[in-house]
Amino acid sequence: MSERQRGTTRPRVPETSAGGFVLCSDGSLRVALIGRLNRGGRIDWCVPKGHPEGDENLEQAAIREIAEETGLEAEIIVNLGDIHYEFSAGNKLISKTVHHFLMRQTGGHLTVENDPQREAVDVQWFEIENLDNTLAHENERRMGRGVQEWLARQ
């Protein structure tokens, strides 16, 4: 029986994040992914992302989050689009939109030491062709395929 059928509903809370795939500056077709511990204690490889702060626009938030979670400085190449999903958090239903960008590394080095929330436990470079086998979430795997398609057209 659904919540609606039972006469109960949880408040739906909209949430926005921005992040993306950062191409390595060495010219290889590798992107930086962060590792987060899942509930089972295993590492899930994910696209770095987070919430805009203050007056930040989506692009600024994505660049800042990349720096915090990966240690990399980056510039945006192209907007890859958005993904939408919902999940439960306590008594709320979070309705999340994540804005993804393809970026190019302009400086920095891989480290999770700058992540203020300490969500990332690892960061590594991964070959773009292996993203389908690496990324933990299907919606991010779809975005990874979009990166491959975009690069193939260039």
Label the model's feature ranges.
Residues 146-154:
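C-terminal alpha-helix
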Residues 21-22, 64, 146:
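Charged/polar positions on well-ordered alpha helices
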Residues 25, 106, 149:
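Residue-level marker of positions within ordered structural domains that often coincide
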Residues 52-142:
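Unchanged
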Residues 2-47:
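N-terminal strand-loop-strand
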Residues 42-46, 121-124, 145:
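A short, polar/proline- and glycine-enriched secondary-structure boundary/capping micro-motif
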